[in-house]
Amino acid sequence: MKILFLSANEFEDVELIYPYHRLKEEGHEVYIASFEKGVITGKHGYSVKVDLTFDEVNPDEFDALVLPGGRAPERVRLNEKAVEIARKMFTEGKPVATICHGPQILISAGVLKGRKGTSYIGIRDDMINAGVEWIDREVVVDGNWVSSRHPGDLYAWMREFVKLLK
């Protein structure tokens, strides 16, 4: 499968790095998209190569989506093309994994009403206001959406996402 990550500078390092390598380990092709090509750097200094700009992404070419957290989603959600990519993939039922602040992009896409999910507690009210039944649990699976709260939930998050991809 081809899996797309949408992110930007100040991502939460382990929330991007762990799933990136975990999914590659499963044999998937993994791509990172951001505002421009080059590298993006996490909150703790880890840098990753950007494969595509948001404008270069054709969501029809990807099978699943990962939205890591940190401060990056606050920036990504302001990019109309990135939000449209997330909206299209989510509404088409493609597997989508979010953690921490990652759901902010889906909130901006307007696709979460009536869904069950979790996130970093700091955006709990935003999730509830978007129509999510917010659950304080390490991982919540609702159809094509797998959500988790923070780095302490990484193993459960990827365990459930990998199951969904099979």
Curated annotation (Swiss-Prot):
Which keywords accompany this UniProt record?
A: Cytoplasm, Hydrolase, Protease
- InterPro entries linked: C56_PfpI-like, Class_I_gatase-like, DJ-1/PfpI, Peptidase_C56_Deglycase
- Describe activity versus pH: Optimum pH is 6.3 for proteolytic activity with AAF-MCA as substrate.
E.C. number, please?
Answer: 3.5.1.124, 3.4.22.-
Q: Which SUPFAM superfamilies match?
A: Class I glutamine amidotransferase-like (SSF52317)
A molecular function (GO) term:
peptidase activity
* Entry annotated with the keyword Phosphoprotein: no
One Pfam family per UniProt: DJ-1_PfpI
Q: Give all residue intervals belonging to the PfpI endopeptidase domain.
A: 1-166
Compartment(s) where it occurs, according to its Swiss-Prot or TrEMBL record: Cytoplasm
Q: Which residues form the signal peptide?
A: none
A GO CC term attached to the entry: cytoplasm
Q: Does the keyword Iron-sulfur apply?
A: no
Reaction(s) catalysed by this chain's protein: N(omega)-(1-hydroxy-2-oxopropyl)-L-arginyl-[protein] + H2O = lactate + L-arginyl-[protein] + H(+); N(6)-(1-hydroxy-2-oxopropyl)-L-lysyl-[protein] + H2O = lactate + L-lysyl-[protein] + H(+); S-(1-hydroxy-2-oxopropyl)-L-cysteinyl-[protein] + H2O = lactate + L-cysteinyl-[protein] + H(+); N(omega)-(1-hydroxy-2-oxoethyl)-L-arginyl-[protein] + H2O = L-arginyl-[protein] + glycolate + H(+)
Q: Report the temperature dependence from the record.
A: Optimum temperature is 84-97 degrees Celsius for proteolytic activity. Thermostable. Displays a half-life of 19 minutes at 95 degrees Celsius.
- Which enzyme class? hydrolase
User: What intrachain disulfides are recorded?
Assistant: none
Documented applications: Being able to prevent acrylamide formation at 100 degrees Celsius, this enzyme could constitute a viable and unique enzymatic method to reduce acrylamide formation in food, whose presence is a worldwide concern because it is carcinogenic, reprotoxic and neurotoxic. The use of deglycases is not likely to affect the quality parameters of foods, in contrast with methods which lead to depletion of the components (asparagine and sugars) responsible for acrylamide formation. Moreover, deglycases can be used directly during the thermal process, which avoids a time consuming pre-incubation step.
- Report any one BP term from Gene Ontology: proteolysis
Q: Where is the active site?
A: 100 (nucleophile), 101
Quaternary context: Homooligomer. Exists in two functional species: the predominant form is a homohexamer that comprises about 90% of the total activity, and the minor form is trimeric.
Hey, which family's this protein in?
Answer: Belongs to the peptidase C56 family.
Q: Which NCBIfam families match?
A: deglyc_PfpI (NF040823), PfpI (TIGR01382)
What task does this protein carry out? Deglycase that catalyzes the deglycation of the Maillard adducts formed between amino groups of proteins and reactive carbonyl groups of glyoxals. Thus, functions as a protein deglycase that repairs methylglyoxal- and glyoxal-glycated proteins, and releases repaired proteins and lactate or glycolate, respectively. Deglycates cysteine, arginine and lysine residues in proteins, and thus reactivates these proteins by reversing glycation by glyoxals. Thus, was shown to afford full protection against glycation of thioredoxin by glyoxal.
Q: Could you tell me what this protein is called?
A: Deglycase PfpI
Annotated organism of origin:
Pyrococcus furiosus (strain ATCC 43587 / DSM 3638 / JCM 8422 / Vc1)
Q: What is the lineage of its organism?
A: Archaea, Methanobacteriati, Methanobacteriota, Thermococci, Thermococcales
